[in-house]
């Protein structure tokens, strides 16, 4: 019993010896990481900029948040000139000012710039110093929408991934305009003055990484030629396109979303949209008289405000394959000339349908199908989601198709 009573004391002595052994040990020396390369902002990840050990330099006209020292905010300040940009700045925000020129001087030391936002200013092409952007070898994102550009602002650095030029006055794209931009994934040219002649030299053909192309609110009468097979999102709303060649999309197998509302489409070849990855198809506000084949991948179909009198389900779904079902969940068909609802055969062909929006029809002002909105097997959560989706799309199609937000919402 005497020996047992001394055991706790022996344990304490052993612990003390172990502690003394490591008392002077520097754990930081053991786990110090080797010198790291400077952290660069990646627009596709959440940045975690290391804290600066000293006060960061910032232009007096701007604000540099201590928590994000690599960003400089100069927006909404009625600036007429671009201030000098410190070397450490990676994100520069100059939108919503009165800037008319982009001289090279302020960018002399800005070698680490990754993103520049110059949208909503008064910049003209001839007021941009030649090569001012091309010298920024780390630049990946450039916003120049809502300015007064008459021409494409080349040359640009090969590092560029996102180029936003919507709402300018650009009317021409020469064949070499986009040369040297192999990394471009998003190109926005909505709300410009482009017509078919601007695409004669096939300016998009060599953009092998292009995934999103926005050409809405222009003057196109035909489909743009030779688009790259990498394309996933194509926006052509508010043009004057009247025809889609039968095999046009055969070279665009990765298309996820296609928006062609507010055009002059009348007849569409039956299998035009037989695409393996298509999720959203918007053909509202055209002159269509009949439907077409629906690919199995499609989830949302918008064909409102057309001249469709009858929806032939057998055209949309010529055969049923129990092991390979269609994924269509939402159809919008209001403002057509329907007098009867879609055949119940549609629910065998499209077993995932949750909502069909009939709304008012154009037979006469008072024509309205008995059920304005058909909803099938909806849980309360699904009901709220369907309602929200419909309200959101209403706003997009009726209010925002000519506004600033012409970008696809992310699917994933």
Predicted feature residues:
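A structural signal for leucine-rich repeat
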Residues: 105-109, 127-135, 153-159, 175-181, ...
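Terminal targeting and flexible regions in eukaryotic proteins, enriched
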Residues: 1-71, 75-76, 88, 98, ...
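Conserved hydrophobic beta-strand positions in leucine-rich repeat
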Residues: 72, 92-94, 116-118, 139-144, ...
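Leucine-rich repeat
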Residues: 80, 100, 124-126, 150, ...
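Leucine-rich repeat domain C-terminal region
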Residues: 194, 199, 270, 274-394
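LRR N-terminal entry segment and analogous cap-like coil->beta motifs
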Residues: 66-115, 119-123
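Consensus "Asn ladder" position of solenoid repeat domains
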Residues: 77, 97, 121, 144-147, ...
């Amino acid at each position: 019993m005497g020996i047992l009573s001394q055991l706790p004391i022996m344990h304490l002595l052993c612990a003390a010896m172990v502690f003394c052994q490591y008392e002077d040990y520097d754990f930081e020396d053991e786990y110090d990481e080797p010198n790291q390369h400077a952290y660069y902002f990646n627009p596709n990840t959440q940045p975690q900029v290391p804290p600066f050990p000293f006060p960061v330099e910032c232009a007096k006209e701007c604000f540099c948040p201590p928590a994000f020292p690599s960003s400089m905010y100069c927006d909404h300040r009625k600036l007429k000139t671009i201030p000098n940009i410190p070397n450490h700045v990676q994100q520069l925000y100059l939108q919503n000012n009165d800037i008319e020129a982009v001289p090279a001087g302020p960018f002399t030391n800005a070698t680490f710039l990754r993103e520049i936002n110059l949208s909503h200013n008064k910049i003209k092409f001839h007021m941009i110093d030649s090569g001012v952007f091309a010298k920024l070898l780390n630049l990946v994102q450039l916003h120049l929408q809502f300015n007064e550009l008459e021409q494409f602002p080349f040359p640009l650095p090969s590092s560029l991934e996102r180029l936003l030029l919507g709402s300018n006055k650009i009317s021409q794209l020469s064949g070499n305009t986009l040369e040297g931009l192999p990394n471009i994934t998003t190109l926005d040219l909505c709300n410009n003055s482009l017509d078919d002649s601007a695409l004669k030299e096939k300016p998009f053909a060599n953009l092998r990484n292009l995934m999103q192309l926005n050409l809405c609110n222009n003057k196109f009468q035909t489909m743009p030629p030779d688009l790259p097979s990498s394309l996933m999102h194509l926006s052509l709303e508010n043009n004057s396109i009247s025809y889609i060649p039968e095999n046009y999309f055969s070279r665009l197998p990765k298309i996820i979303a296609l928006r062609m509302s507010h055009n002059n489409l009348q007849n569409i070849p039956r299998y035009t949209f037989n695409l393996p990855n298509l999720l959203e198809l918007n053909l509202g506000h055209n002159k269509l008289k009949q439907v077409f084949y629906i690919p199995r991948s499609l989830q949302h179909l918008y064909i409102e405000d057309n001249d469709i009198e009858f929806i032939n389900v057998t055209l949309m779904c010529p055969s049923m394959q129990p092991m390979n079902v269609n994924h269509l969940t939402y159809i919008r068909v209001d403002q057509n000339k329907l007098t009867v609802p879609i055949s119940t055969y549609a629910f065998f062909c499209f077993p995932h349908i949750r909502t069909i929006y009939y709304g008012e029809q154009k037979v006469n002002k008072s024509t309205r199908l008995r059920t304005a909105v058909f909803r099938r097997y909806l849980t309360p959560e699904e009901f709220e989601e369907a309602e929200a989706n419909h309200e959101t799309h209403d706003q997009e199609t009726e209010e925002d198709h000519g506004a600033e937000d012409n970008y696809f919402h992310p699917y994933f």
